């Protein structure tokens, strides 16, 4: 069980899975940097930057639990407090396992693709009411490839820059990096194009 940085608990794991492991990175880069002691720290920095931007764990499907109070700014009460709209801290919610309001199980709900959960027939909810939601959220293997490729790109260029490399060629294609671009390369830093790639994964709900 892990309490994440995003206000919810991962209930089925003891450690948060990596988006991209060092072995996967070495395979994706044909072992170009294999044995470099900086790979682990660069992967960690890139992963931290990506997860901070998207606002959730961005990994394979994991069991999650999130707790709210009626006064929480991430929820909205409608129809006299008998219907709750909750912004779950996740994209790609694959299942809702259990919902309780003040200990009472609620079975009528609807989940939107952006992680907004609508819960009906909950009775009167006060500011101090406790809402507990157990759900599954995460990416399929195919969907996870974009984040893996982005991390590999970041770490590759960060390591290349630290070696003083200003141009590379592969498969007949040559790329030269501008001085300004090189100066701003960091594994944790996201460019505008990176943010476009991550847009489908970023938490953007009702609030």
Language model features with spans:
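Divalent metal-cofactor coordination and adjacent catalytic microenvironments
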Residues: 1-207
């Amino acid at each position: 069980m892990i309490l994440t940085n995003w206000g919810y608990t991962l209930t089925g794991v003891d450690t948060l899975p990596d988006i991209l492991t060092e072995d996967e990175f070495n395979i994706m880069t044909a072992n170009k940097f294999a044995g470099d002691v900086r790979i682990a720290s660069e992967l960690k920095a890139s992963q931290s930057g990506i997860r901070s931007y998207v606002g959730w764990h961005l990994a394979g499907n994991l069991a999650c639990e999130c707790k709210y109070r009626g006064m929480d700014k991430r929820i909205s009460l409608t129809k006299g407090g008998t219907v709750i709209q909750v912004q779950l801290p996740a994209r790609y919610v694959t299942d809702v396992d259990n919902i309780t309001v003040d200990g009472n199980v609620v079975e009528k709900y609807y989940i939107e693709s952006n992680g907004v959960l609508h819960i009906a027939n909950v009775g009167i909810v006060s500011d101090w009411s406790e809402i507990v939601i157990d759900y599954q959220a995460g990416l399929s293997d195919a969907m996870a490839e974009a984040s893996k490729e982005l991390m590999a790109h970041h770490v590759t260029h960060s390591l290349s820059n630290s070696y003083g490399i200003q141009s590379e060629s592969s498969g007949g294609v040559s790329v030269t990096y501008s001085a300004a671009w090189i100066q701003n390369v960091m594994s944790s830093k996201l460019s505008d194009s990176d943010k476009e790639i991550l847009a489908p994964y970023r938490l953007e709900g009702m609030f």
